[in-house]
């Protein structure tokens, strides 16, 4: 066993850990050890670097932890996929590259919780801007010199994108020119974490590339954190496995857990911090009985509403092996073409009922009919909407099953446990069908492939959801921030009752945000990095933002009325 000492030890080189490693080592007198269980982000591996290849990392275990849930009781007892990134970049190395920050009211809602007043939207917006370089330039909402490259969809891409946005507007919903700007609500172009050269903009590329050569940062890959070490109620270091060696590293200041919503509570529990009854089941000495560790687990569930496309404009030909070498060559040489996009270039957020204070349904539009992980491709030209509810009241948990750090934990999201879940998914299917019936899609829209136009009743739609809904890969909230009995960390990510230990990742969200989670996770890390460094917080923004204030969910009648059921 070998022993080393650093000021900070970061467990997990993902969306948050790479931010912290980069920001903390900007101070040359600070030493940081960054541990990552996976390997490097190989820049010549098209599976992680080509945006259009986003499905490939989910099909293996090189870059994916490939967790599975316990049988989900409300989803036909299916064991459901729970892919998380493994390697430098974490889940930003394998995600769908959709840059969505969430709704302003998500953060204003966080700030209504006691002790979280400094997490209001206008307090968070400066940190979103700090992290970002947007290709069309900065403004009150977007940054121009941050580590994360953000590309905005341009006119003239696949005609299905423009048609689907226009169909949403014809159905009576708003149009928005920026889902991360003044108004999230509505349909419009979607920002993506893609570089100007058409490469995935993971946090390994954006952040670590700035910091790799610093003498005060040591990055160790294939390093699996076993447990956090304590002296009384103070974290003093980490024991990790590196090859055949067990290594101990000591932290002079803090241990920073950035392992994500599944592995962060798993590491805490394995180290003796968590629900006492769970720890005693595995004969783990209890350092602190903290009941919220692993509880409050949340995710976004989504379904694919798929249609045949009457015109040959979908991405269906790109799925054929004989067309892929040309696509790959253009991407590799020029950074352009079909390979340079994740093809989630349009989407939207709507309220399905007037009394919803902010959007409860998200859309990703895709000009092909296929599962997110590349499976079940429809053998014809098609298109689809990924549709799901945003703030499910259902809550799950992550529970340790073994003291072995290689063993996966027990994961139960408890999807669709509440009546509101079912109402929102039925509403979403019916709203989507109405959108797809609008004149803008007449030249493209063929028959409905999924769920199938013959499924109309509540019971039929519920049966479809149970059998076909899937994760959107947004686990969060399992080490929530706050000050109630189930809170795990305070407003600066410090674990309650323990000195020298923080959790900084999507697990500390008190409530899941409206949209994808990569951008909010980066923001959280940027904000807490300033707290760790004892920097003055960035000046609060004075940007304006949209609040519905009871306005109708639709501004007008649909161009084409709903079909009679």
UniProtKB/Swiss-Prot annotation:
Active site as annotated: 474 (proton acceptor)
GO CC annotations on file: membrane
Reaction(s) catalysed (UniProt annotation): choline + A = betaine aldehyde + AH2; betaine aldehyde + NAD(+) + H2O = glycine betaine + NADH + 2 H(+)
Record carries keyword Oxidoreductase: yes
Binding annotation for FAD: 7-36
Pfam name, any one: GMC_oxred_N
Pathway where it operates: Amine and polyamine biosynthesis; betaine biosynthesis via choline pathway; betaine aldehyde from choline (cytochrome c reductase route): step 1/1
Keywords: FAD, Flavoprotein, NAD, Oxidoreductase
The enzyme's E.C. designation: 1.1.99.1, 1.2.1.8
Disulfide bond positions: none
Function of the protein: Involved in the biosynthesis of the osmoprotectant glycine betaine. Catalyzes the oxidation of choline to betaine aldehyde and betaine aldehyde to glycine betaine at the same rate.
Family designation: Belongs to the GMC oxidoreductase family.
Protein name stated in the entry: Oxygen-dependent choline dehydrogenase
Gene: betA
